[in-house]
Regions:
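N-terminal glycine-rich FAD/FM-binding segment characteristic of electron-transfer flavoproteins
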Residues: 1-92
C-alpha cells in the first residue's frame, strides 16, 4: 500500500501545484505509515519530484497523452492505483 500522487505538468515540466501535491502526499504517507508513489505523464525531468518525498516514480510517456484527454489520463491513473495497491490518491 502506498499513497499515489498524480503530478500535473505542462510542456514536460512539473507545475507548481504538482510539487505541492507531492509534498502533501508525503505528509499523508507519514501519517499512514507508508510511502509515496508518483505518476508522471510526459515529464522530461521526473526525478525532481523525489525532492518532495516521493520514493517511487511511475513514468508514463506517450504521444497519445501529449494533449490532455480526460479518459486516457484517468485510465493511466486507474492502472497505477491498481498496480500499486494505493490506499490514497492525491491529485494536483
Amino acid at each position: 500500500m502506498s499513497v499515489l500522487v498524480y503530478t500535473e505538468s505542462d510542456n514536460g515540466k512539473f507545475k507548481k501545484n504538482a510539487l505541492e501535491a507531492a509534498s502533501y502526499a508525503h505528509k499523508l504517507a507519514e501519517q499512514l505509515g507508508t510511502t509515496v508513489t508518483a505518476i508522471t505523464i510526459n515529464v522530461e525531468d521526473s526525478e525532481v519530484i523525489g525532492n518532495y518525498g516521493v520514493s517511487k516514480i511511475l513514468k508514463v510517456t506517450s504521444d497519445k497523452l501529449s494533449i490532455f484527454n480526460a479518459k486516457a489520463y484517468a485510465t493511466a491513473i486507474a492502472q497505477a492505483v491498481e498496480n500499486e495497491g494505493a490506499s490514497a490518491i492525491v491529485v494536483s
